[in-house]
Amino acid sequence: MACSAARPPADQDRFIFIYPAYLNNKKTIAEGRRIPISKAVENPTATEIQDVCSAVGLNAFLEKNKMYSREWNRDVQFRGRVRVQLKQEDGSLCLVQFPSRKSVMLYVAEMIPKLKTRTQKSGGADPILQQGEGSKKGKGKKKK
């Protein structure tokens, strides 16, 4: 087996992986969350992670059909992972602001709520929920 130090850091096998479960505030640490729950995001998707990484200038690839091993739900919403390049060919960092995988995860979790797809969803869903709350759900039996 080849030593990982022998391969160049820019080799695609040396990219870091970010699964949505790493950033999900609905997961426990045992279920795969890797950042503090106060900084985690509600149900992030691999596409959102890739959008944030690409926007900041990181080299990121989306792998849609990959699944996190601890994810029990096989739904399409929970599939995917993102490969992110941290180091260049010579071993130097691609971006100085991201020295580690944890710094990338914290930045992505901070930026996902600011995405246009997130802000539009939350604004449009509130009026629909408020309309349905006024109805009663049937009668109970009277006590004698």
Swiss-Prot record:
Entry's Gene Ontology BP terms: SRP-dependent cotranslational protein targeting to membrane
Record function comment: Component of the signal recognition particle (SRP) complex, a ribonucleoprotein complex that mediates the cotranslational targeting of secretory and membrane proteins to the endoplasmic reticulum (ER). Binds directly to 7SL RNA. Mediates binding of SRP54 to the SRP complex.
GO cellular component: nucleolus; nucleoplasm; signal recognition particle, endoplasmic reticulum targeting
Subcellular location: Cytoplasm; Nucleus, Nucleolus; Nucleus, Nucleoplasm
Protein's name according to its UniProt entry: Signal recognition particle 19 kDa protein
A GO molecular function held by the record: 7S RNA binding
Family membership noted in the UniProt record: Belongs to the SRP19 family.
Residue span of region Disordered: 118-144
InterPro entries membership: Signal_recog_particle_SRP19 (IPR002778), SRP19-like_sf (IPR036521)
Superkingdom, taxonomy of origin: Eukaryota
Subunit structure: Component of a signal recognition particle complex that consists of a 7SL RNA molecule of 300 nucleotides and 6 protein subunits: SRP72, SRP68, SRP54, SRP19, SRP14 and SRP9. Interacts with IPO5, IPO7, IPO8, KPNB1 and TNPO1. Interactions with IPO8 and TNPO1 may be involved in SRP19 import into the nucleus.
Alphabetized UniProt keyword annotations: Cytoplasm, Nucleus, Ribonucleoprotein, RNA-binding, Signal recognition particle
Pfam families reported for this sequence: SRP19 (PF01922)
SUPFAM superfamilies, alphabetized: SRP19 (SSF69695)
Annotated PANTHER family: SIGNAL RECOGNITION PARTICLE 19 KD PROTEIN (PTHR17453), SIGNAL RECOGNITION PARTICLE 19 KDA PROTEIN (PTHR17453:SF0)
